[in-house]
Structures are given as C-alpha cells and as structure tokens.
Amino acid sequence: MAEGSELMSRLMSENADLKKQVRLLKENQMLKRLLSESCQESCGRGSRDLLYPKVPTYPEACSPGNGGPDFGRFAGVPDTPSQLPTSSLEDLLCSHAPLSSEDEASPGCATTSQMPFKSFLSPSELHSRIADRKLSPLLSPLQDSLADKTLLEPREISRPKKVCFSESNLPTGDRSRRTYYLNEIQSFSGAEKDGRIVGEIAFQLDRRILAYVFPGVTRLYGFTVSNIPEKIKQTSIKSLDGSVDEKKLRELTHRYLTLTARLEKLGYSREVHPVFSEFLINTYGILKQRPDLRANPLHSSPAALRKLVIDIVPPKFLGDSLLLLNCLCELSKEDSKPLFAW
C-alpha cells in the first residue's frame, strides 16, 4: 500500500514537471514572436529614414528605325561568370555613397532584441523558471536545445538597395576611387528572363561597336571589343601576298579611336568596360531569340530598361551597368536605329 502511494505521488510530481515544461515552451514561442515583431517595426522605421542617391538621367527615347544587319548571336554562353582582375572596376565606381551593406548595421535593430524579453519577465522570475526547467529529468536534451534555440535565431533584416553611379562629368582628379571585387557576385539575383535582358544590353552595345569599327563585315565570329586592335591588324592583311594594307589599317584604326573617344565622354573605359560587358554576358546570358520590338515595347524604352537594370544588378556593379545602357542609348540616338538592333 505504501509503495502504491509513493508511486502515485511520484507520477503526480512528474506530471506537474511536464506541465511546467510545456508552459515554458509556450512562453518561449511567445517571446520569439514578440522579438520578431519588435525588430521588424524598428527596422521598418529606420529604413524609411534612409536617403537614396539619385540615379543619373539617360535618354528617354530613341528614334525608331530599321534594324541593322543580322550579324548573328553568341553561339554559347558559359554558365559561370568570367574572372576579371580584382581592381578592374576601381576607375568607374565612385565612393560618394556607401555600397557595401556590411559596412553599417540597420538602425534600430541593435537593442530591440533584448527589450521585449526584459519587459516580459523580471530577472528573478526568469532565473526561477530556468532553475525549474533544469529539475525535470524527463525533458530530453533535444527538446531543451530546441527551446533555447528559438530565442537565439538570427533575424533576417531587409535593407534598402543603395545605388551608386559613375560621375563622368567630374574632373578625374576630383573623383574618389574604390575597388570592388568580382567574387562578391553572390548578390546577383532576379528572374532568368529579366537577367538575360541585362546581358542583352551589353551584347547589343558590343555589336554596335564592332559594326561601326568593321563596316561590311557580316561574320564577326571571334571578334570582341577587347580584341579590336588585334582584329584590325588581322583584317588589314592582304590575303594574296600577306602584306599589310596601310590604308585600310589607318581607316579602321581611325574609326575605332573616334568611336571610343565619343564613348569616353560618357565615362566608358577601353581598359574596363569591354571586359565588364563580357562578364555581364557570361553571367546573365542573352535573349534566345532576336528581340521583337513590336511584341515587347520594353526593348525600345530606355526608362524601362534602366528600371530593370536597377532592380536586378547588385549595387557594386550597378554604376557600370547603367553606364553601358547610357552608351547604348547614345549610339542608338546617333544612328537612328532601335536599341536592340541585332
């Protein structure tokens, strides 16, 4: 009889401990919800106070016209981005606006994670409940660790996108330079279709440059903006005797230097942007079919293309991407052809 009474008393004690553990788990869930709501509200107030630098203006319309001759499209585009020198972008992106989201913490989130917890439980009550939880031998270590983990989970805070662009109208000596590295390309995001338009912008600019430097050449396989000087020498060699056609060499060189001089006024760099265009094409790809301007007005709207680039391209590469779009718009305006003419 005494053994039965002792067993009953022990079962009742264990049952009370189990109820206490369940109550603690519910309180942990409530604390987690309070912490999350408080941090989101504080971060929401802080993000509304941030100032966004203005995006430079670009031509809002291009004169419609007939597309240029179809020179074909890239046969294959690698899935992995090409590697550029680590300092290849330092001459194009200015540092008047901070770009790295890791450089500064979001305002209002430093202390909010502790305030709801302290206001919900006093230190003495919290200490007593933690002590009670350690008394129960029936709660598995896995359940205990999960209960504690709910209070320590990191909160993902959405931060506003910062935009920086090259100030090509400033004197060279007045510009502040900063180096950015291509191994930070992990922030690239966006739908595949929209991303292909970013690569298409770079592709169309390259094709426009090649078509201008090499007029009449319909097969541009192996031609890139980066190797234009080498290709000028190759195309200037006479096929009959292998001698150099000096007249053709001077003509092609003059066309190349004239065009790059016009683009350099917009901030284009022969050392940086040809390789950067290849990088965008390899990263995003290009449109699978020749753009249909009547079916998709986006391809003929500089404003819509600029908004798409801002939404997709990471901040550290946004300035140079917008510069390529600006150059494409200027060339399209001068030759009276659509933006996507090839």
UniProtKB/Swiss-Prot annotation:
InterPro entries: SPATC1, Speriolin_C, Speriolin_N. Pfam families: Speriolin_C (PF15059), Speriolin_N (PF15058). One of its GO terms (biological process) is spermatogenesis. The keyword Cytoplasm applies. The keyword Phosphoprotein applies. It comes from the Eukaryota. One of its GO terms (cellular component) is centrosome. Keywords: Cytoplasm, Phosphoprotein. The modification Phosphoserine is found at residues 63, 136. It is found in: Cytoplasm. Coiled coil: none annotated. GO terms for molecular function: protein kinase A regulatory subunit binding. Belongs to the speriolin family. PANTHER family: SPERIOLIN, SPERIOLIN-LIKE PROTEIN. This is Speriolin-like protein. It comes from Mus musculus. The lineage of its organism: Eukaryota, Metazoa, Chordata, Craniata, Vertebrata.
